[in-house]
């Protein structure tokens, strides 16, 4: 009996195409991952990303948040490589993968229903990588399309684009070569009407250029939104009904009516601890009054607190009043210090209200650069920024754990903000690491990290091109569309506000932006307003607080930092410096105590705790690669005598011949009549003959010396 085989058909297969920034974009549905709620294979150029979305059948019990997870998986087969790990498998997501997951999460999360509690998983797998076509953009588009055509409740779709700035011109989705010279890298995600996410790194770009880039991306995103809307109309599934999160509106209305005055009094303070203590005391009053009538009220307390506080904060802000009494354009009290820690290479303490960040800078040799094994073009990082957020910073008793996605994201934002002002390796041959320790948190810790890190780098003697400061902008909107923006948001304003628009930069321009939203997006008017008020604020922070603390980078690196010398040799002579089996360089390291790194282009970096060791190592290398200059005078030692002349060593292990006719002004019969082994003499380098031998002249050297002495010149 023969085996029966039936050819598999894909009756639900659909393909949609458009051109995006001059390259083909294809969305395929119905062929892969059919058991997911929806799956879209996005191919942009030769980049392919499979985007799958799934949702649980019922809500998760006992939670008051939306359980969304987003994973961006970097597969090394996408770039034709095998992982370098022991088992040759991809491990945990790298930093770039985590950051991309956050970039996908931030624009889609606010577009889910506020009372939706079903688990939702978004998984984007990079299966083919074309460095000219961003997998991040492909994943954003694919996620938007998958959610839009799925049966999962969601208020999309969105479109996504990157914008670069090359030779003063805005470029959509710049390719690999353009990105290398671009002064701007901004990712913009939009719905059909508003902007829902901005993530930017820039080389001190002015507000007008940044605004034009965002505006251009928002306009171009409408083409993607239109394509996905077409997909929804043709193959979209009806959205499923879900149990709405339980909420006791009757009890909440009673609490608001009876406790509004007490709640306002509790909120009206600039001290986070006082506010929380007052609120907890008021909750006890709720219990005393309502527990008998509503025995299940405890399950609603967190949501009651959130909604009640938001009601107060929103009303106050729309009236121009803030919980700590500040004006909308007023920054909390600031202070800045440097040299806080005695033995580190550089340190800066930046305090803004109850937010306090201690940043520490460390300098090391270039061998300490972080090596990267990812799908991206970047293979190493010379400047690294790490952000730590311990429990004690918010008064919580919890154990220390490895950095989470939030810590990695905040560290990357500060890193991106400062990278444009870090000196090039040719001017400052150090690997640089900054660690920002959040020791107290009441909002805007990432921006405090940027300010503190600028102080630490300047204290460490890193010659940054300009100081960088960061500030955040918040937003409250009324039901009629009117809005209020306010500067320097603290924790309670971040929690209950609708926007955290973080902008970092110098007085010249922007270096980084990160925008988080809790609403359905921003109009261009709000974005323009946020850019303007954050510029004014960061200039004040620089002029009034940071620059009076330390006006410019210290002229020298810390005495505890390694001393560095950079030199260049002919790449063909690298083997002479290294020696057979590394014998020569190992001897130099042993004699000098210095650490030596050699690049393939002949660049050599020498590092040591003291300058003397660096000088010893440099001299050893100089001696090895020494090439004399024709016509130059050298003071050398006679090492051998022959019948036809004397060999004079003009550098360690390097000698040349002074022919007998060149040993004296007059004729001599024997070499011994002019010199003996061990004598020191001046010689002039005459030539390298056809056999590579060095020819020297004592006679010509003395003639030149006498002429210089007669002219009053000093011989060195």
Where are the regions that the model predicts?
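Conserved helix-loop functional segments at active or binding sites
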Residues: 106-114, 149, 340, 365-368, ...
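Single-stranded RNA-binding regions, centering on S1/OB-family and related RNA-binding modules
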Residues: 560-562, 571-716
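Mobile "lid/hinge" segments at catalytic clefts and subdomain interfaces of large enzymes
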Residues: 151-267, 457-555
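Glycine-rich, flexible beta-strand/loop modules in the N-terminal catalytic cores of phosphate-handling
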Residues: 24, 36-121, 126-128, 133, ...
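Extended amphipathic alpha-helical scaffolds
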Residues: 2-56, 241-377, 562-576, 584, ...
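Conserved phosphate/anionic-ligand binding catalytic regions in large, soluble enzymes, centered on
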Residues: 38-41, 133-151, 338-361, 442-462, ...
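Long, basic N-terminal domains or extensions that often function
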Residues: 2-243
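Flexible, glycine/charged-enriched surface loops at secondary-structure junctions
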Residues: 114-120, 155-157, 224-242, 273-274, ...
